[in-house]
């Protein structure tokens, strides 16, 4: 796949890479709940000046955020990533120890980052 066929998706610090046409289809329901459990209260998307697709998600709580991320580790939870042709995924936010272990089993490069005390994100080993 040529690099020009990819666009970046940023979700409050998270970065996804995927095929732009598939991502556009995925985002057609923008403004509704992020997932079927409604873990996020709101999401919206736009194209930035440097041609990146920006997604913002607002969660009710850390528990809602964790529920959203844990959904990726369920059976067939990675289907959206495979559908979009993602080459890598970076997830930034509070994560649990079991998520760190599950991320190692994902069928594509999946990196977890956590908040550092100074507000930056640091990669989890």
Predicted features along the sequence, with ranges:
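Short S/T/G/P-rich N-terminal loop/turn motif that feeds into the first structured element of a domain
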Residues: 1-53, 60-70, 74, 82-125
């Amino acid at each position: 796949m040529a690099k020009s066929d990819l666009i970046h998706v940023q979700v409050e610090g998270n970065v996804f890479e995927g095929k732009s046409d598939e991502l556009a289809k995925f985002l057609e329901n923008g403004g509704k709940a992020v997932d079927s459990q409604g873990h996020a209260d709101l999401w919206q998307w736009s194209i930035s000046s440097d041609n990146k697709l920006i997604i913002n998600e607002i969660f009710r709580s850390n528990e809602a955020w964790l529920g959203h991320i844990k959904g990726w580790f369920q059976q067939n939870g990675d289907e959206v990533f495979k559908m979009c042709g993602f080459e890598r995924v970076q997830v930034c936010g509070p994560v649990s120890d079991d998520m760190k272990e599950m991320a190692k089993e994902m069928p594509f490069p999946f990196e977890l980052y956590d908040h550092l005390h100074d507000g930056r994100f640091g990669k989890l080993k």
